Amino acid sequence: MAKRPEDTRVVVGMSGGVDSSVAALLLKEQGYDVIGIFMKNWDDTDENGFCTATEDYEDVIKVCNQIGIPYYAVNFEKQYWEKVFQYFLDEYKAGRTPNPDVMCNKEIKFKAFLEHALSLGADYLATGHYARVDRTDGRVKMLRGLDENKDQTYFLNQLTEEQLSKVLFPIGQLQKSRVREIAKEAGLATAAKKDSTGICFIGERNFKTFLSQYLPAQPGDMRTMEGEFKGRHDGLMYYTIGQRHGLGIGGSGEPWFVVGKDLEKNILYVDQGFDNPLLFSDKITATNVSFVHKGVFGGEEELACTAKFRYRQADHEVTVRMTGTDEAEVVFKEPVRAVTPGQAVVFYKGEECLGGGTIDDVFKDGQQLWYV
């Protein structure tokens, strides 16, 4: 028989934001033995000695005191640097556009942090993610968050059934507006705090300035695929496929977009038109492919499902075929725009998130595209 809530210890990963605050509050109200833990993953002290993590931790302390739960801080800076930040830099060096949130969830939050929580005698780790865990039929499934606009399964695609069996998502069945209401009704210190956006370790800083501190930029030519010179770029790492802003190409006609990169020659390829054929692909190869449930193919060679190629994008019908232990070929039913190497491809069957991988090479009509 399952343990009673009062005999069940839950560690809540608290960021100092409203979502994790409400997650902790709901668990406490349900009678669980709740501990709030703040993870420090990045030393973001700026040149004036100000560190946003300090402010966030102060908010965690306020909320935990309001709810009446103990709180701690734990430092994962070393693991974060090695597992997330180095990967982030390596991907940019390779001309790709990485997704550090996916790697942070895989290596830090639901690995290092989960292990830490279990070592404290926790039965579960809870977070403020908009996702749901379904334990109804003897299997543990991950379902999309009910708030379509906030669903975060895209970033959780690398979680395994084993990890999910130890995880709770208390706000996954709520709309964001309701989460804010609950925080307000309870008078939580974070009720009106704005959501953090962008990459956690960059924060409000300028992306180019931040990246240039770690990777030397190599400016080069911007050209059309026919070779026509269109200007200079600041460094290939600053541009992503389908990007429109920051190209600085004047003139009349349709807007210009990034349609390709040549890492060897350091050329950024550009062309006009949002629906430019050069921006569309019909197949990818993916690496680091992992599924929540091992038997997802059910003995078949191919898996028909839908996929997202970027966060908050519509689902696209695809067929997945494994080509190695963690490598796959993904064929699209219809061409998809601006599929970007380094980003996550995430697979779904209806409400269920099946797993995902990293977009590697991109193809159109059998030809590999100049996307890296």
Swiss-Prot record:
One of its GO terms (cellular component) is cytoplasm. The active site is at residues 104, 200. Keywords: ATP-binding, Cytoplasm, Disulfide bond, Nucleotide-binding, RNA-binding, Transferase, tRNA processing, tRNA-binding. GO terms for molecular function: ATP binding; tRNA binding; tRNA-uridine 2-sulfurtransferase activity. The keyword GTP-binding does not apply. It catalyses: S-sulfanyl-L-cysteinyl-[protein] + uridine(34) in tRNA + AH2 + ATP = 2-thiouridine(34) in tRNA + L-cysteinyl-[protein] + A + AMP + diphosphate + H(+). Residues 99-101 are annotated as: Interaction with target base in tRNA. Residues 150-152, 310-311 are annotated as: Interaction with tRNA. Its EC number is 2.8.1.13. The record marks 129, 343 as: Interaction with tRNA. Its main location: cytoplasm. ATP binds at residues 13-20, 39, 128. It is found in: Cytoplasm. InterPro entries: MnmA-like, MnmA-like_C, MnmA-like_central, MnmA-like_central_sf, Rossmann-like_a/b/a_fold. It comes from the Bacteria. Disulfide bonds join 104-200. One of its GO terms (biological process) is tRNA wobble position uridine thiolation. Catalyzes the 2-thiolation of uridine at the wobble position (U34) of tRNA, leading to the formation of s(2)U34. Belongs to the MnmA/TRMU family. This is tRNA-specific 2-thiouridylase MnmA.
